[in-house]
Amino acid sequence: MPKYDNSNADQWGFETRSIHAGQSVDAQTSARNLPIYQSTAFVFDSAEHAKQRFALEDLGPVYSRLTNPTVEALENRIASLEGGVHAVAFSSGQAATTNAILNLAGAGDHIVTSPRLYGGTETLFLITLNRLGIDVSFVENPDDPESWQAAVQPNTKAFFGETFANPQADVLDIPAVAEVAHRNSVPLIIDNTIATAALVRPLELGADVVVASLTKFYTGNGSGLGGVLIDGGKFDWTVEKDGKPVFPYFVTPDAAYHGLKYADLGAPAFGLKVRVGLLRDTGSTLSAFNAWAAVQGIDTLSLRLERHNENAIKVAEFLNNHEKVEKVNFAGLKDSPWYATKEKLGLKYTGSVLTFEIKGGKDEAWAFIDALKLHSNLANIGDVRSLVVHPATTTHSQSDEAGLARAGVTQSTVRLSVGIETIDDIIADLEGGFAAI
C-alpha cells in the first residue's frame, strides 16, 4: 500500500515544498500536522548515545536551546525554500542578524553594509557592534559596485544588505555586490525578510548567507516572533590573505569540542558553527510554539505573497497619481530608479512594503495616519492586514539626521505594508486618509 514519502521533496516545486518539505508524518502518532514538541530535553538511548550527541557525532536533539523537533522541521523547510544546506532558527530576526555577524567578526574586525537598512539593524550596527569592537562602514551608494569596493578595509569580514530595503523599498543588485565581496574574499549576507524565498532566492544570485525575520511574511499573521539564518554552503571559510586565515574562528581548533575545526564540517560549516557555538552560548532560541506558528504560515506563503504584491502594485499606482503625494518609493513602478535592477534580476514582484512622501510634513503625515480605519498603525510588516506607520518617529526614531537620510526617511515619509484585503477597500481607506489633510 503506498505511503506518504517526502524524502525527495527537493525535486518538488516551490509551492509543494512550502507544504511538505522538512517534516515527515509523526512516527508515534501518525499526526498529519506538525506536532508541537514542548519539551526542554530529549532522552538518550544509552550513555554512548549521549556522548555521541554532545560530541556532534550525532546531530539529533539534546536540549531545546540547540535543537527541537518542531523547530528543526521549520529549519529544514526554510533551507529547502531558500536553497541552503543548513538553517538555524532564532527567537527573532534581530537575533539571526546578530548571530550571522558574530559568527564572522569580533573585536577589531569590520563590516561593510548598505545604508538602506531597517532601523533596528542600523542601531545594532552603530551601537551594539561598536561596543563589541566591530566597526561598520556604510557604503556611499549601494547601487554602485565600486562604492562597495571603496569601503573595504584589510580587516573586513562581510558585506551586508537587504534584498528589498525597509523602508526605502529599493532592490539590491545582489549579483554585482556578491562579485565585489568575493573579489575581497568575504561573504555577502542578505536580509531577505521582505522578499522571502517566494519572490527572491539570494543564494541563487550569489549571496552566501541569508537571514530573515520569520515574524513578518513567513509567519504572515502577526502571531509570533522568529528569525532564521540560512547557510548557502558554498563559501570557502579556509580562505587566506597574505598567508593568514581571513576567518580564524573556522580553522582554529575549538576547545569546547576538543579541537574541532568548523571548516572540517564541510558545506554546512557556517550554520553548524552558529548553532553549536553562538546559539548554545547566547540562548536566542526560537520556541517550539512560535516555530509551529511559522510553519502554519509557510503552508500558504506563495498564495499570500502573490496577493500582497498584486495589491501593492495597485496601491503604488494609486499613490503615484495622487495630488497629495510628492513621491512614491516602490521599485515596481516604471519610473523608480530601481526598476532597471528589478528587470535585470528577472523579478516579477518587488515586495509589498513601500513608502511615500506626503505633501507637507509630520503634521500631514500624522493626520493621514490617524484618519485611517482599515489600516493598523503599528510597528510591524508582513501581516495579512494592511499596516501603516510614521518611520521617523517610530521604527527609525533612534536614528540621527544622517541615519534618516541614509535610510531615505523624512518627516513626510509614510510606510505601508500592504495586506491581502480587497484592494478596493484598501484604496478607499487611503482616500479617507488623504481627505483628512
Curated annotation (Swiss-Prot):
Cofactor(s) it depends on: pyridoxal 5'-phosphate
Instruction: Write down the chemical reaction(s) this protein catalyses.
Output: O-acetyl-L-homoserine + hydrogen sulfide = L-homocysteine + acetate; O-acetyl-L-homoserine + methanethiol = L-methionine + acetate + H(+)
List the Gene3D superfamilies hit by this protein, alphabetically: Aspartate Aminotransferase, domain 1, Type I PLP-dependent aspartate aminotransferase-like (Major domain)
How is this protein's activity controlled? Inhibited by methionine and cystathionine.
Query: What happens to activity at different temperatures?
Result: Optimum temperature is 37-42 degrees Celsius.
- Write down the InterPro entries for this protein, in alphabetical order: Cys/Met-Metab_PyrdxlP-dep_enz, OAc-hSer/O-AcSer_sulfhydrylase, PyrdxlP-dep_Trfase, PyrdxlP-dep_Trfase_major, PyrdxlP-dep_Trfase_small
Functional pH dependence: Optimum pH is 7.0.
Identify the Pfam families for this entry. Answer: Cys_Met_Meta_PP (PF01053)
Describe its partners and assembly state: Homohexamer.
Function, as annotated, reads:
Catalyzes the conversion of O-acetyl-L-homoserine (OAH) into homocysteine in the methionine biosynthesis pathway. Can also use dimethyldisulfide and methanethiol as reduced sulfur sources, leading to the direct formation of methionine. Has weak cystathionine gamma-synthase activity.
> Under what name is this protein listed?
O-acetyl-L-homoserine sulfhydrylase
Say which species the protein is native to. Corynebacterium glutamicum (strain ATCC 13032 / DSM 20300 / JCM 1318 / BCRC 11384 / CCUG 27702 / LMG 3730 / NBRC 12168 / NCIMB 10025 / NRRL B-2784 / 534)
The gene behind this protein is metY
